[in-house]
Amino acid sequence: MFQCFLYIRDPNNASEVDGNHYAMPLTISPVVSAETMKVTRIDILPTGVDNTIKEPSPYKVQPPNEYIPEAQNIRMDVKPLNVVQPEGASFQVTNFSEQGRAIAWQKWEFKVGFNQREGMVLYDVHYDGRPLFYRLSLSDMNIPYADPRHPYHKKAAFDLGDAGAGIMANNLQLGCDCLGSIYYLSAVLNDDKGEPLHMPNCVCIHEQDAGIGWKHTNYRTGRAAVVRNRELVLQSIITVSNYEYILAFQFNQAGEVMYEVRATGILSTQPIDEGISVPWGTVVHPGVLASHHQHIFSLRVDPMIDGPINRVVYDEAHPMPRSDFNPHGVGYTVNETPVTISGGYDQNWDANRIFKIQNASVKNPVNGKSVAYKIIAPPFQKMLADKDSFHFKRAEFADHNIYVTSYKDGELYAGGKYTNQSRGGTGVRSWADRKDNVLDDDIVVWVQFGINHVPRIEDFPVMPCEILKVALKPVNFFEKNPALDVPPSVQSFNKSVLASMNHGQEVSEAVVGEKAAVCCVKEQSKL
């Protein structure tokens, strides 16, 4: 059965097919049989402060609330900002199969695939020839809504399991979705009849400047050493009905991998009586309610940190007790605890708990520590739905920051293989409950992150990007900062220019020593 929510176009501008119909929700909700494709009943939606159902009344036309550019008074003071690489991009793309592509960039090497459910998947990630990750992908996503009334209590979308990050991917356009020197990847999936479905430009690859990578100024001599932090970005954008997700893997020159999610698009809306408010949502337009909801993501990390046998440990910082050795009470230590059995594990922000994926058999030649990559994920509020609710039972990944499981073929999706009308019991929580050994074994790490989206009126008619990022960073993996060999940031390379007093762009390049002098590394060193 399908519970359908209906909207209308602006009756005063019905020919505008791109009008924002989410600003005009209706109070009727047909229920359609998936077997017969016929309407079995029509529910009347509650629109007040409780679950009382009112008799339908003529629709009251509200003013439109549009997001399309032609409906706005566009700013006229935005000047061009061009991303130019006169010698082209620094990455190379080669074919290793009919569909797969291999990427090489700044000591990084990996393969890229694309499938119907996960969308973009990375394989065999190496840095300077050393293995790091066998497979990286966004495994699952759940969006449970907060309205407890029928029929809204059913709203809990699995945007990957129910729809698919691959099949919902946008055709990315040059100059719109990615800026600079762009390389596009296309894919071939299949439609619901098993026929080939061409997905053009579903991934864009480009470089971006991410600010300063590292810097130090010798205050004794005034000499500054500084490098820029350049990133390689692989980006895909999916549209799942009203919502957009901008999904990107990012690599930098310091051996770090990031996974970034930008949530944007339009809120899922429902009708509400004028002049009232409810504690489970925000009124964003006259007669329009946007319910509170969570976005909970699960990133699947299949590691091979210097080899296939890995473990997960976590560090915690604790104060040292006062003693003759610590008479002033300022000392603290960091303790490491291994994770030995599969299960769900959580952050402890008070102890600065940091999870690391470690290879205990490979030691750093400088300090003797085990080589590792640490997981840095933003804090998020875990699933708020009751543990006996179907929301909680179905989203098996939504109750812990980290899950660690032993590797098993076919265990790819944290919410289970089939999420549509699922009952739970087939996802990562169930796999972790096997209590397998995960100490020095072939393991998989599942990293959860997300947001509790309490809508604000600024999120409508289209929401500014909400940005989330997970980082995988080396810990005692290298012998020193791996970005030391990045070319210094100098004016002769970067070609920056001075802006005039009225903020117009000068045609001449900036020169060190002029007004608003540029701070760069000396190009000649005495060392």
Where do the protein language model's features map onto the residues?
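Noncatalytic N-terminal accessory/assembly modules of large enzymes
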Residues: 1-2
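Extended effector regions of multi-domain proteins
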Residues: 7-254, 262, 266-275, 282-527
